[in-house]
Amino acid sequence: MHSVEVVLDDESDRWIRRQWTALAEAGVPSQARHSADSRGESNRPHVTLALTSQIDPEVESRLRDAVGALPVPITIGGLLVFGSTRFVLARLVVPNAAVLALQAAVMAALPDGADATVDRHGTFAPGRWTAHITLGRRLTAADVGTAMHALAGVPRSRGADGALTRARRWDMVAKREHWLDPAG
């Protein structure tokens, strides 16, 4: 299984990491907890564009073409809470034409597109995808309240504008990242 992801500009990356840290310091599940595990630097703030079961050289070539429009400007929006029992806390990436076109191009490059065996909930299907940056997973309802308070103290030095700058695929089995852009 592979995910196709885009990472943030340096300032946005630092801001999200400060939020991860604030959550961890407040005792709330946070993506910061992955920093010390085997993923190391591969644990980066990112937006997942698609999931796929396999990526052969032909598909990787199509993906490289699909992400050719990077960098893409973004606005990082408010907090999102997904789930009903255990929650995912995330920051919205406000949809714009460039972000939606990038995600559609990546989906079109994949052989299984929105295959239900890969994307069980149709999360990445056209019109169903919600661009977001995960801050923490498996939060309780009480954790969500604590998180809101903790994140109120994490200012951003430059508004909400940023950019999606580079693309990678994450091999979930090998736990390895593969950059899809020329700088990778």
Residue spans for each PLM region:
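Glycine-rich beta-strand-turn "strand-cap" elements at beta-sheet edges
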Residues: 79-84, 162-178
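Hydrophobic alpha-helical segments that drive targeting, anchoring, or assembly
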Residues: 88, 92-95
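Basic, often amphipathic N-terminal segments
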Residues: 1-74, 98-158, 177-184
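Generic structural hydrophobic/aromatic packing signal, biased to beta-strands
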Residues: 4, 74-79, 90, 167-169
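Charge-rich, low-complexity N-terminal segments
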Residues: 85-87, 120
